[in-house]
Every structure is written in C-alpha cells, then in structure tokens.
C-alpha cells in the first residue's frame, strides 16, 4: 500500500525507479479524470429534456464513438492544459470541471425551463441571464448534489493523491503549447465543421425535426462549440456577391403614393396564442368564452397563422423578422437595411415602445440600427407608469394607452410607423394557485391542479390583453387619422417544466407532422384597419391572409394596403409564392404541408433569395 501511495504521490527522496510508474499513473489518472468530467456533462445532456428517454440517449452516446470523443476531448484537453500551466493537478481539475460542468448545468436548466438549449450566441446575453431566469424555479435535484460530491471528491483526490507536477519549464511550455495547438486545430477542423455535424446524426431516439432534440442527441459541449459558427456572419451556400447584387438590383424601391399614406401600428404580443386551436381546449366552453373578444376582432380583420422559428422564448427572432423581412440573420451591430428604414425614407415617423429595459436583447442599440427614431423603454418613459416586474402581469392597458396618445400627438407631423413589444404574460406562470378566474379545474378538464393553475393564470393574462386590444381598436376607430393595426404573437407560451401542461392536453409536438409543427410553432396574427384607412386604401381588411413565416408578415401588410414597397420586399413576394415558410430548420410549406424538400428550380431560387438577403443585411447601407 505504501509503495502504491509513493507511486501516486512520488514524494521527494522516493526510489527513482518509481518515477516512470508515477508518470504512467499521472497520464492515466489525468486523462480518466478529464473523461469523468466530460462524462458528467454528457449525463446532464441526456437528462435535460424530459420528453426523451435519458437512458436511451446515454446509450446512444456510447454507441457513437465520434460524438463521445468530441464531448470528452475538451475536458481532457483542459485538465492537461491546467496541469502544464500551473504545475498542479488540482488546478487542471478546476480548469476543466468549472467550464465543462458549468456549461452542462446551464444547458440542463435552460432546456428544463424553456425547452431551449444553450448556444454560443447566448453568451452575449450573459448580463441579462438574471432577468431571463429570475421568475423560474430551478429544481435542485439529486444530480445537483451528485455534482457537488464529484467536485469535492475530485478536488480532494487531485490534491492528496496527485500532488506532483513537472518542474522543467521547457516540458511544461511544450505541453501547454501542444494542448493549445490541439484545441485550436480541433475547434476549427472538427467542432465548426458542418459536414462532421451532419455525419454525426444520432436520430434513433429523437425527432430529427426538433432543434432541442437534435442538440441533445449530440451531447452538450460538442453542439455548444458547434454553435460558435453562428456568432460570425456566414454567407449562405453558393453565395456570390455579384449575383446577389444583380438579383436585388433587378427591383427598385417603389414609393407609397401620397394619397395612400396611412399610419401603421404594430404590436407583438408576448407569448400570445389561441389555445382554442388545441383540440381539447377548443371544445372547452370556458376557454372558448375567454377568447371571444379575440375571435370577434378576427372577424373584423385579415387573419392567419404566423409560423415562427421559436417556442416559449427567443422573442426577438419574430420581432426582427417582422421589422426586416429576413428569414435568418446575424446579430445586428451596425445600421442595417430594414422595413423601418423604408418607412423613414417615405417620410414616416418611426417609433418603438416596450415597457421593459432597453438593454434587454440590446434593443436600445438594435432598434437604432434598424431605423427607429424614437424609443420608449422603462428607462426613459414607462418607469413612472409601471415597474418592469409589474409589467409582466399588468401593463398592456398602459401600453396601448400610451401608444394611442403618442399617435394622436405625432400624426399632426405626418404619418407614423409605430411598433411595440408587449411584456404582459411573460412566462413562467404560477403553478401553485390561480390568481383570478378558474377557467379550468381538475374536475371540468381532467388536468392536474398544477396544469390548471398554469393555464388559468395564462388565460387570465391574455384575457386582459385581449380587452386592451379591443379598447385600442375602439380608440383608433374614433380617430380621423387612417390607421392600420397589426397584432401578432411572438411564440407559444411556456407550459410547465418539460412542457408538462401541454403533455396533459395530449399535445405531442410531433414535429414530423404538419399538425405537430403548428402546435409547436404557430401563433395568430391579424391586420385590422379603422374606417378612415379602409376608405383611403379601398380595402375592407377582412378575410384570410394565409399562413407564413414572420419574415413575410410585413409583406402581407403591404399587400393589403396596396403598396409595392422596397426592392427586397418585391423579391420576397416571389419567394413567398414558392413557399410561404422559410424556417430556421430548413423546413418549408408546400401545398399546406411542412416539408424539407423543394423542387430543384425552387431550391435554386431559394438559394438566390438567401444570397440577396445576406447581401442586403451586410452590404446595403440604409439611408444612403
């Protein structure tokens, strides 16, 4: 036993013959320790999404050696890097354990709470993380305590049984540079490779149409590192700047006729959806009654479904798609061409409003890049009216009152484009009690009390939202100024950890079917006009507007108004005729069915459209 301890610790004065055995022990134990850390990360990944069988997912990792290696390699490389840098194995353990397990835990809770994996782009929102998760309940499970045990045990093991380190600085420098070189080459050659990512498909136990399930099927560290490619502008496949410029220049911006200039107000409603679209609730009298104001408003409007890229979070994807027409885009860090800039070029005043902080999603900067001249946030307007915390529960009446007053004040100076993002009904929703009306009870619905509380609290919030929107239409109708109003939901609401509330409703979210896709991604929209606008535009603004991606909503608005619009919008009309949905998962809508395949000619046009879109986003200087 003493000889074994001497091999592990190699105290000064030990038999020189033990040095080689100690080196072998150190190499094996450090590598094994790194593999254990990586393995703990994989266990977090496998158990993150409650919809999946965690044991089956773990088994799939073991049967896919490339996925296994790509998830273990960073932990092993980091533990060796720390050892060479600091000459202590415990330092290597910390350098490996903290980032690898930290990323895995954040991903675990993010999926548990929002069905949304951790991506590299989320790092830009690190300062906002507290605001995002503040209302959620983090369940401290046995896995959390097991992680604490592993951390303490691993640290003690490396301190007392692996204390020795290299004293020769040349060997340490060589080892450090070797680790860095390995990590750099692996990152650029393996972790950012789309080809390798596709070739590591692990679809046996998942639905390949689900982003979160595909992410989980590849572990955590590997898909997280792969997502770094999304942090940098990447042109679409086959992109040629000259061809993109030529395609876009085939169209010219068309002015809005002076006699047809009407003010436009858009409001994106937080987590708004029509629960009566779900079969179980569509037959429930109390739920149908709650949505009567919305259904009556729909009868007076052009209506349809917005097919979003997101679920229960990621609000700005729908928001910015509407404002820009981009089906996909990079983060906005400079003035970027958008429909807001077009309105400005037509003499419109452009105004943005949100009863929350301007730093959230960096809206205060992004909105300026997209062309808004005036912005109202908590910081500069709403703080005196409602706190951001209270705004989650009760702010829509305040919002629409401010919007109506602002419009009345500003229209004297010319037509307005006003866009607002609501905050009321932001999830999660209280699970332990119902705050007001009990639309659903375990007796009349067959749901658990927790699910009843979730849906009741959501319904009470949206009922107030609908009341506010009806009030707004009445105010706009009374105005002499012609106004067109666009209302739409950004994404489906949170429905319990692991989507428990949806599961009890029998909603499977089977994304391989069109019905399941709609259940997961669709939200309603409507385009309403006051009498003055109907007269000016010669349109009654009633009927079916169709179902389409968020990027085509502004196009439909222009169609209803009889406006040609900017050059890019004219191109987008052609794209919409081929497929009204260009989804973030490379899915399309053809003849009313979701598909991942287009005819060759249509696919070629899609690539040309994406190229023109990329050119517009990155090369066109708005206002020039």
Positions of predicted regions on the chain:
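Membrane-interface micro-motifs in multi-pass membrane enzymes
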Residues: 114, 120-123, 136, 209-221, ...
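Membrane-interface segments at or immediately adjacent to transmembrane helices
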Residues: 189-266
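Short alpha-helical interface patches
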Residues: 114, 122-134, 143-146, 222-233, ...
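Transmembrane and membrane-interface helices of multi-pass
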Residues: 2-211
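Alpha-helix initiation and N-capping motif
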Residues: 123-126, 218-225, 244, 291, ...
């Amino acid at each position: 036993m003493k000889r074994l301890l001497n091999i592990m610790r190699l105290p000064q004065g030990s038999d020189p013959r033990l040095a080689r055995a100690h080196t072998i022990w150190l190499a094996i134990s450090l590598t094994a320790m790194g593999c254990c850390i990586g393995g703990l990360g994989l266990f977090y990944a496998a158990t993150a999404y409650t919809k999946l069988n965690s044991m089956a997912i773990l088994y799939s990792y073991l049967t896919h050696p490339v996925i296994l290696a790509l998830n273990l390699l960073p932990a092993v490389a980091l533990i060796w890097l720390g050892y060479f840098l600091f000459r202590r194995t415990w330092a290597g353990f910390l350098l490996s354990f903290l980032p690898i397990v930290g990323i895995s835990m954040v991903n675990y809770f993010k999926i548990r709470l929002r069905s949304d994996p951790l991506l590299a782009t989320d790092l830009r929102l690190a300062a906002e993380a507290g605001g995002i998760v503040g209302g959620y309940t983090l369940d401290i499970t046995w896995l959390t305590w097991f992680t604490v045990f592993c951390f303490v045990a691993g640290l003690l093991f490396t301190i007392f049984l692996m204390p020795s380190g290299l004293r020769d600085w040349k060997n340490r420098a060589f080892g450090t540079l070797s680790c860095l070189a390995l990590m750099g080459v692996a990152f650029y050659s393996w972790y950012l490779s789309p080809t390798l990512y596709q070739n590591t498909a692990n679809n046996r136990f998942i639905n390949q149409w689900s982003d979160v399930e595909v992410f989980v099927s590849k572990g955590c560290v590997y898909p997280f590192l792969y997502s770094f490619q999304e942090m940098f502008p990447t042109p679409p496949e086959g992109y040629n700047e000259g061809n993109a410029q030529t395609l876009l220049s085939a169209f010219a911006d068309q002015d809005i006729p002076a006699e047809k200039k009407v003010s436009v107000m858009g409001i994106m409603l937080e987590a708004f959806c029509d629960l009566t679209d779900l079969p179980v609730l569509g037959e429930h009298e109390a739920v149908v009654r709650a949505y009567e104001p919305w259904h009556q408003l729909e009868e007076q409007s052009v209506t349809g479904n917005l097919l979003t890229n997101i679920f229960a979070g990621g609000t700005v994807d729908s928001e910015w798609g509407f404002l820009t027409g981009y089906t996909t885009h990079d983060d906005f860090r400079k003035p970027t061409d958008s429909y807001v800039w077009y309105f400005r070029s037509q003499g419109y005043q452009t105004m943005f409003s949100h009863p929350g902080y301007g730093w959230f999603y960096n809206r205060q900067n992004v909105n300026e890049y997209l062309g808004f001249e005036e912005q109202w946030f908590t910081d500069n307007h709403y703080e005196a009216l409602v706190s951001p915390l209270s705004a989650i529960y009760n702010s829509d009446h305040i919002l629409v009152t401010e919007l109506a007053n602002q419009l009345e004040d500003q229209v004297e100076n010319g037509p307005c484009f006003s866009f607002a993002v609501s905050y009321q009904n932001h999830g999660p929703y209280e699970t332990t009690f119902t705050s007001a009306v009990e639309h659903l009870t375990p007796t009349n619905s067959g749901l658990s009390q927790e699910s009843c509380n979730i849906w009741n609290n959501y319904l009470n919030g949206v009922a107030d939202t609908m009341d506010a929107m009806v009030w707004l239409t009445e105010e706009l109708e009374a105005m002499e100024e012609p106004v067109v109003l666009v209302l739409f939901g950004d994404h489906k609401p949170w429905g319990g950890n692991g989507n428990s509330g949806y599961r009890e409703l029998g909603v499977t979210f089977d994304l391989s079917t069109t019905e399941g896709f709609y259940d997961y991604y669709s939200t309603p929209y409507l385009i309403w006009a006051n009498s003055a606008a109907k007269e000016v535009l010669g349109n009654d603004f009633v009927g079916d507007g169709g179902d389409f991606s968020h990027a085509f909503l502004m196009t439909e608005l222009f169609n209803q108004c009889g406006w040609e619009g900017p050059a890019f919008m004219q191109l987008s009309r052609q794209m919409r005729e081929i497929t009204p949905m260009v989804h973030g998962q490379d899915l399309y809508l053809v003849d009313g069915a979701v598909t991942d395949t287009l005819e060759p000619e249509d696919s070629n046009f899609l690539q040309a459209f994406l190229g023109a879109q990329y050119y517009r986003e990155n090369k066109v200087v708005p206002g020039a």
